């Protein structure tokens, strides 16, 4: 990636990873990603975050091309896709100081073995004067990790927001040119990474609303010249508002649960409810996570394997529980051959959800006409609950 000018004193010196398809050995990356790092030039020069260690060579080449001496590295976040090249930068610039907060210092020392004497510690509201330019540090715990912070370039009104407001999107565009292009990756990123911290994010959005910000420069994806484009979407996603939607992760072994799912989908459609089914044997978990951002209800469908739920259903329940979406209702449908505790175990897997659990539907063998009536009753109950929310 070439060096790109953000403002008169800010340069993007990070890396685009066009080929990466999995993050944290967990999150699919259908659109690749980028690791954004920024140089702020003045009498002193600051490097804001670094890049994934697989791309260290690109970062170092960009710094050499700019012909700068790095006086300060600002570490907004300790995760290695942003901090992993810090050791190489410290090695290249021996007098460089590593500027971060106390919690981030601890993590960086533990994860990257950085010597304590390299650190310069800042707290919320502290500033670093580079010359004519001033960096202000804003603590943002649990917008992602407990040590996350933002850096604000006062004179040019640039917010370096780290992972917050980012998107896993490999693009040659420095700035968002078409919101339609970035909406899906940004929402997917929020769903997979940020949604568990919804309550904390609300507070940090209020902080940003009180600031004069002209450019949002995240650590992944393109930058925003109109910050309200991305903050407005986040305000919607973190609100308590839900939509007339049911998310339906399912798996079926011999067709019984699939027959229930197909009937349930039809019953929901007949009642004017949007349904989003995900066959867990092939589903993209990022798409499943995205669907949970807005939905009022989630229903997991599973057969019984030995005495418990199918492992794919367990994974779906664990994912829903970990992401803690704002859905209001949940239920379980499925089948069994001779017994088991499928429903009970799935319930236990979703204890983080602050939802009303609607009566599950569990059938023995292939569903009968009476079983389909029970599924219709569940669809009726969901319709009623959604109407009570004016959906």
Map each language-model feature to its residues:
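Metallo-beta-lactamase
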Residues: 4-8, 100-148, 200-203
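Active-site metal-binding motif and surrounding structural segment of the metallo-beta-lactamase
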Residues: 43, 54-99
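Active-site neighborhood of phospho(di)ester-bond hydrolases with catalytic His/Asp-centered motifs
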Residues: 48-50, 70-78, 98-101, 159-162, ...
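Short acidic active-site motifs
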Residues: 85, 284-288
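FMN-binding flavodoxin-like domain, especially the glycine-rich phosphate-binding loop
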Residues: 171, 181-216, 221-222, 263-276, ...
């Amino acid at each position: 990636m070439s060096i790109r000018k953000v403002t008169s004193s800010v340069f993007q010196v990070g890396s685009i990873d066009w080929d990466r398809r999995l993050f944290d050995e967990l999150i699919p990356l259908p659109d690749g990603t980028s690791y954004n790092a920024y140089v702020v030039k003045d009498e002193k020069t600051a490097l804001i975050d670094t890049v994934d260690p697989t791309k260290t060579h690109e970062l170092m080449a960009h710094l050499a091309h700019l012909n700068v001496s790095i006086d300060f590295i600002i570490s907004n976040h300790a995760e290695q896709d942003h901090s992993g090249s810090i050791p190489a930068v410290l090695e290249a610039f021996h007098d460089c100081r590593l500027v971060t907060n106390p919690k981030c210092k601890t993590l960086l020392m533990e994860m990257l073995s950085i010597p304590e004497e390299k650190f310069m510690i800042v707290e919320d509201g502290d500033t670093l004067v580079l010359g004519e330019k001033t960096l202000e540090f804003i603590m943002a715990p649990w917008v992602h990790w407990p040590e996350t912070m933002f850096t604000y370039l006062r004179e040019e009104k640039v917010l370096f927001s780290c992972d917050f407001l980012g998107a896993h999107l490999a693009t040659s565009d420095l700035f968002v040119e078409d919101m339609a292009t970035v909406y899906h990756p940004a929402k997917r990123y929020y769903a997979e990474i940020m949604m568990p911290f919804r309550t904390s994010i609300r507070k940090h959005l209020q902080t940003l609303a009180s600031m004069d910000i002209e450019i949002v420069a995240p650590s992944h994806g393109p930058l925003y010249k109109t910050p309200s484009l991305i903050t407005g979407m986040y305000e919607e996603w973190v609100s308590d508002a839900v939509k007339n939607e049911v998310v339906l992760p399912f798996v079926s072994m011999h067709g019984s649960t699939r027959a229930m799912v197909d009937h349930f989908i039809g019953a929901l459609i007949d009642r004017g409810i949007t349904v989003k089914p995900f066959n867990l044997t092939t589903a993209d978990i990022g798409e499943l996570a995205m669907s949970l951002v807005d939905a009022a209800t989630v229903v997991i469908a599973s057969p019984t394997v030995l005495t418990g739920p199918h492992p794919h259903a367990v994974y779906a329940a664990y994912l829903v529980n970990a992401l803690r979406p704002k859905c209001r209702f949940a239920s379980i449908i499925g089948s069994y051959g001779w017994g088991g505790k499928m429903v009970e175990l799935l319930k236990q897997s979703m204890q983080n959800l602050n939802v009303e659990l609607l009566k599950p539907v569990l059938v023995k063998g292939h569903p009968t006409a009476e079983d389909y009536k029970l599924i219709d009753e569940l669809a009726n109950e969901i319709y009623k609950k959604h109407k009570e929310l004016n959906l």
